[in-house]
Regions:
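Glycan-processing catalytic domains of CAZymes
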Residues: 1-181
Length: 181
């Protein structure tokens, strides 16, 4: 299958940005490495930057483009260096665009480290489990622990004037088993 050319009728990214602009909305473009090709992990960040550069070249002038979102759902402090590089690459195109990531809330140090990245604007925190039918998940990630990490994370980003979002994941698998069916 051939890739759609920017501006062509098959260009879904361009279409989404044009529709967003028409309705007064903005959008973050999701960026990650090219998962259609095998590559060592050490090359993933350079692949991500290459894709981001291509997206900026194609869509950087679109009024609805608000920024870039790294959808790799990392956890732990190892994610910090990747986000620092990702955000710096995005801001190299335009200091005014937004950057975002969605880490798991499972390391209290991660909240502070991500908040310290000046170029990171939005942190979308998520728990491995925030609401689950699975008893093993509730034992592993009790609601109180998720609440504590969410509070810590929101506090860390508030001090640095960042946008903090969190979401609840509702899992529907095994519900019949737990409902007694």
């Amino acid at each position: 299958r051939k890739a759609a050319a920017a501006g062509s009728p098959e260009d879904r990214v361009g279409l989404a940005l044009k529709l967003a602009a028409e309705y007064g909305l903005t959008a973050l473009l999701s960026v990650s490495w090219d998962m259609t090709h095998e590559m060592p992990y050490s090359e993933c960040l350079s692949s991500t930057k290459k894709i981001m550069n291509e997206l900026w070249t194609l869509y950087g002038n679109e009024p609805a483009l608000a920024g870039f979102y790294n959808y790799q759902e990392g956890s732990g402090t190892y994610l910090v260096w990747q986000m620092r590089e990702f955000c710096a690459a995005a801001k190299s195109h335009d200091r005014g665009i937004l950057t975002a990531c969605a880490p798991y809330i499972d390391d209290p140090l991660l909240a502070g480290y991500l908040a310290a990245i000046d170029e990171l604007d939005i942190v979308i925190y998520q728990g491995a489990v925030m609401a689950s039918y699975r008893k093993d998940n509730r034992r592993c990630f009790p609601y109180r622990r998720v609440k504590d990490f969410a509070s810590l994370s929101a506090g860390a980003t508030r001090v640095k004037n960042k946008i903090t979002l969190s979401h609840v994941e509702l899992f529907g698998y095994l519900e019949k088993q737990y409902a007694g069916h």
